[in-house]
Design a protein with these regions (language model features):
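Intrinsic, low-complexity N-terminal interaction/targeting segments
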Residues: 1-20, 26, 64-120
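Short cysteine/histidine-rich metal-coordination sites, predominantly Zn2+-binding motifs
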Residues: 158-167
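Surface-exposed, interaction-prone regions used to assemble/regulate multi-protein complexes
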Residues: 11, 20-27, 37-38, 58, ...
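Short, structured motif recognition centered on aromatic/hydrophobic residues
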Residues: 24-29, 49, 53, 97-99, ...
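N-terminal interaction modules that seed assembly of large macromolecular complexes
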Residues: 19-52
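Mixed-charge, glycine-accented linear interaction segment located at domain edges/termini
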Residues: 39, 103-157
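Short, surface-exposed beta-strand-loop junctions and turns on beta-sheet-rich folds
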Residues: 33-35, 44-46, 55-56, 104-107, ...
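Short helix-loop boundary/capping segments at the starts of domains
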Residues: 51, 55-62
Length: 167
């Protein structure tokens, strides 16, 4: 069974990707008091988390504090485990957003409980995460205007053109 983590005042919370477009591996990363945790995630999990946080921030008071600037992944990028699901909540008393990531268990791992990572972030950290995630999504593969599928670096055989147009 993998380790669980709880960060109540992280100084770093971000998403990042390693590898060329089309082959990138996505990560969520948090650090508190020298403890760095990196979790492997899916691109769509990062996108969904950013969209949800963006919507949540619209319902909360404006971010008054300074947003973190450097949201790069911190080396070494060693994944603790793979994310299966992400949940988000708001702790009104502490004015913190709770992000909970749950571990994906492999079938052969048996009946143990999945690990979790609980991270309490500020509204400024959430706003910075949203901007970082948006930049990550834009840095991916170009989208075909006809079929809305990502284009590979070597070109794209568009199904809407019945495979006849390679662009």
């Amino acid at each position: 069974m993998s380790a669980s983590f709880e960060f109540v005042a992280p100084d770093h919370f971000t998403a990042g990707a390693v590898g060329p477009p089309g082959q990138r591996i996505f990560y969520l990363q948090s650090r508190e008091k020298g403890t760095l945790v990196t979790l492997k995630s899916e691109k769509e999990q990062v996108r969904a988390l950013a969209q949800y946080l963006s919507g949540l921030l619209e319902k909360l008071p404006a971010v008054g504090e300074r947003m973190p600037r450097d949201l790069s992944l911190i080396e070494p990028v060693n994944e603790a485990w793979i994310v299966a699901s992400i949940a988000v909540g708001y702790d009104e008393a502490r004015d913190r957003i709770l992000v909970v990531a749950n571990e994906l268990l492999e079938e052969e791992e048996g009946g143990g409980d999945p690990a979790s990572a609980r991270v309490l972030i500020t509204r400024a950290q959430a706003a910075a995460f949203v901007k970082q995630a948006e930049a990550l999504m834009k840095a991916g593969r170009e989208i075909c205007p006809w079929c809305s599928q990502p284009k590979d670096p070597g070109g794209h055989t568009c199904p809407r053109s019945n495979g006849h147009v390679h662009h």
